[in-house]
Amino acid sequence: MMAAEAGSEEGGPATAGTGGAAATGSSAYPAACRVKLPAAPPMAVAPCPGLADTDLAAALGGGAASGSGFLGTGPVSGVLGGAALTGGAAAGVAGAAAAGPAGDIALTKGTLSLPAETLGPGGGFPPLPPPPLLPPLGSGLGTVDEGDSLDGPEYEEEEVAIPLTAPPTNQWYHGKLDRTIAEERLRQAGKSGSYLIRESDRRPGSFVLSFLSQTNVVNHFRIIAMCGDYYIGGRRFSSLSDLIGYYSHVSCLLKGEKLLYPVAPPEPVEDRRRVRAILPYTKVPDTDEISFLKGDMFIVHNELEDGWMWVTNLRTDEQGLIVEDLVEEVGREEDPHEGKIWFHGKISKQEAYNLLMTVGQVCSFLVRPSDNTPGDYSLYFRTNENIQRFKICPTPNNQFMMGGRYYNSIGDIIDHYRKEQIVEGYYLKEPVPMQDQGQVLNDTVDGKEIYNTIRRKTKDAFYKNIVKKGYLLKKGKGKRWKNLYFILEGSDAQLIYFESEKRATKPKGLIDLSVCSVYVVHDSLFGRPNCFQIVVQHFSEEHYIFYFAGETPEQAEDWMKGLQAFCSLRKSSPGTSNKRLRQVSSLVLHIEEAHKLPVKHFTNPYCNIYLNSVQVAKTHAREGQNPVWSEEFVFDDLPPDINRFEITLSNKTKKSKDPDILFMRCQLSRLQKGHATDEWFLLSSHIPLKGIEPGSLRVRARYSMEKIMPEEEYSEFKELILQKELHVVYALSHVCGQDRTLLASILLKIFLHEKLESLLLCTLNDREISMEDEATTLFRATTLASTLMEQYMKATATQFVHHALKDSILKIMESKQSCELSPSKLEKNEDVNTNLAHLLSILSELVEKIFMASEILPPTLRYIYGCLQKSVQHKWPTNNTMRTRVVSGFVFLRLICPAILNPRMFNIISDSPSPIAARTLTLVAKSVQNLANLVEFGAKEPYMEGVNPFIKSNKHRMIMFLDELGNVPELPDTTEHSRTDLSRDLAALHEICVAHSDELRTLSNERGVQQHVLKKLLAITELLQQKQNQYTKTNDVR
């Protein structure tokens, strides 16, 4: 049994690892910090100072013992630590030893061994909250200059059963330390794998992990301390000790290298700032504030703006915000345990007895300073019969010894004996708190004025230099997207995100943009628009990636541009001044077809597209070994480090991720800039094909490096393009058949910037109508006019689409009721009449919403519809339906029905529809399109004839709706300014002119009226090319 205090407090060995016996095995540490270590040989145990002979005899279990501190006078058994070592009638535990010859103490009937290196949670700086939520195991991190920082993606918060163990804090924490001195200390240690953590001397409040690698290079990794958490390499930890434990036992810091040897400071460092509450406070609901009592002690983690601080309350272990007006500094001379709920630093021994007997219950406890040995502590514990005391001795290496066991903190001792018996049949339960919180405080504080001051403080200023803020969707681990609140902080180039704007204090995560690139994400990758990704790039091969989505294309573009300005790779790109040349690269890929894919591996092949090693897009799956995709992918404003594209082929299955089977790579340097390359690429295989040829893939690629001069250089070029006759536009339309989509996009942005989009669209539409002989084939072909109209509608009518469709589509997504009418697709015993009734109900609600949404369409778009109606009426005056059908062909065929069929592409939903919902959306789109065409279902789809009564009853309303859309006779004034990069758009159009200069030259010799304009265009194109070369030379000189 462990002897309690009698006349003197129980002693114990003072030095760990020399003369004291420490318990070994898993019971010596909390379960979450357990690690197996090799056992050292049995060691001699030195007698403890102040331990009476009778106490020693009882502690060793040598027979009957008596005294006021014991439970009885007969044989005694005690439990302290879980390892029973017996040496007589009594069973003694917790480092029990027996007196041997010459006064030495030898172990009896058991072996106590001391680990060569005692590991456990840190007991010094910083605080040790519960274990962190660990990310998946990963490869190493890259290194950065200390002025930079290193971070990565947020991982989903989930409990991972990985034990984290680290040496005590005093073995690796050096406090504020110069970089040069840190490197000297590591080199003096002389072992690769040596490490230390220090506070950055360049960025106070941040920490640096300094590590000596196998190449004898000292690498410095910045650790971002934020509201009690610690971020490094995309991973978040609750303490520096957990971070050390993770990179010691779980993951590599550099490729193949872990933390091995802590380098201790010359003497232990304790530099945490502590403050004490001078007044009580009750938190404001739904904030990150914490409530506290007068006298509570806090550890300060972050000093935020406007007097706010992020702290841990030592009494409750709660973290949150407090304001500095309610606290006072705690000096270094005060005991570091002040503020802990179990610590009583200013009461006597008798007062401790009285508290336990009056306020406490059986198994209650408290800790106070030792009366007999300054610097030591006594743990007071109440049993059924009496109060027992146990001595706690600090050791020179900043640990604490009790009963022959070594711990990293008194808190660890308490945690241990909450789980293990401290006396047979007893565990520590509830501590007795201090009874008079005000005894150490100045009672003359003017609380009223302080509280009034706090009410005037704002928490909006926690983060300095906020460049941009707002909500974005962020992709989680699976297919879920979550709406989070983001702050782009400019001073430290960090993107910080939170659960909501109301709780924008403690981050959910952060990304250090100085080691990042921003990549576009094609709509095909997630089946939704407006996505982009931030790639955290390390020296290791693995990338950490964050995916985001904006509500609109403009929002996504704004965020991308804002983020790119702080990415280190962007900062290094040449030409940031308005008076210098900018360079922007882009890539257009057409995945056309594959030939002779291996039959064994492909039934439903699809392609994944990568820029370098980052996936940015994918095609649809197609059937067979000779699939045809004919899909286009445009990647704009590429990061400057992109030097190749890769295409892999996978086979579509029901698995969450299909493995890549075949692949091809192409260096961008192979492609002629500004020209389309059409080539069959031989495929290589990731798996053995056993003599089978992997096949080939046809890809058309166009890589362009845009050299963008200041906007004023393009003034004459712009005037020529904007001439109301549109001769240049017609000529480019003639020569740019394969680049039609790109040409349309550039022209639309230029004309939108000049508020001349109606001139462009109406003129091209009129020309299309004038050239068409058959009313039934009008706008059926894909032309520059139809492409421009489609792009313009998607750019301006998003609000209309959401208002008209979102509610109905969300109901379809949630419903389990089928709308299937086709006999070949009906399930057994499925009632087709029930399905039809459900379909008609959906159609009625949806069409009603569409009819009521006409006023939401932009007035300029409605004016263009009106111009279309006038033009077709003039061309076909006897055709009464053309004015209706020409508008429905754009509004429904190219806008509403595509949004119904694929609502993710229009950002209406975030998850893929179920098979039932997908089929319902198809039937709804089919029915709505027939209604818009004013056509009933016939013999081709007889199972759909049940929808005909609905179509008949709504034909008149459809005609009225479409006529109303075009009822804007005058071009409306608009105050909206198109947010485009005009100089870039003009430069891109100039590149198209350069690429097609030969065709334009041929055309200028054929077209009489346009001849003068085209020759002028060619001359301006050549002049701009010369100016561009001059800018390039100037940039090279600089």
Swiss-Prot record:
InterPro entries: C2_dom, C2_domain_sf, PH-like_dom_sf, PH_domain, Ras_GTPase, RasGAP_C_SH2, RasGAP_CS, RasGAP_dom
Key words of the record: Acetylation, Cytoplasm, GTPase activation, Phosphoprotein, Repeat, SH2 domain, SH3 domain
Segments of skewed composition (Pro residues): 124-135
MF (Gene Ontology): GTPase activator activity; GTPase binding; phosphotyrosine residue binding; platelet-derived growth factor receptor binding; protein kinase B binding; protein tyrosine kinase binding; protein-containing complex binding; receptor tyrosine kinase binding
One BP term from GO: response to xenobiotic stimulus
Subunit composition and interactions: Interacts with SQSTM1. Interacts with SPSB1; the interaction does not promote degradation. Interacts with CAV2 (tyrosine phosphorylated form). Directly interacts with NCK1. Interacts with PDGFRB (tyrosine phosphorylated). Interacts (via SH2 domain) with the 'Tyr-9' phosphorylated form of PDPK1. Interacts with tyrosine-phosphorylated EPHB4.
Subcellular location: Cytoplasm
Name of the protein in its database record: Ras GTPase-activating protein 1
SUPFAM superfamilies the record matches: C2 domain (Calcium/lipid-binding domain, CaLB), GTPase activation domain, GAP, PH domain-like, SH2 domain, SH3-domain
List of residues that carry Phosphoserine: S822
SH2 domain: residues covered: 172-263, 342-432
Function comment: Inhibitory regulator of the Ras-cyclic AMP pathway. Stimulates the GTPase of normal but not oncogenic Ras p21.
PANTHER family in the record: RAS GTPASE-ACTIVATING PROTEIN 1, RAS GTPASE-ACTIVATING PROTEINS
The record's account of how the chain is modified after translation: Phosphorylated by SRC and LCK. The phosphorylation SRC inhibits its ability to stimulate the Ras-GTPase activity, whereas phosphorylation by LCK does not display any effect on stimulation activity.
C2 domain sequence ranges: 568-681
Pfam families: C2 (PF00168), PH (PF00169), RasGAP (PF00616), SH2 (PF00017), SH3_1 (PF00018)
Gene designation: Rasa1
Site feature: Arginine finger: R780
Protein species of origin: Rattus norvegicus (Rat)
GO CC terms, sorted: cytoplasm; nuclear membrane; plasma membrane; ruffle
Domain PH, first and last residues per copy: 465-568
Residue ranges constituting the Ras-GAP domain according to the UniProt record: 755-965
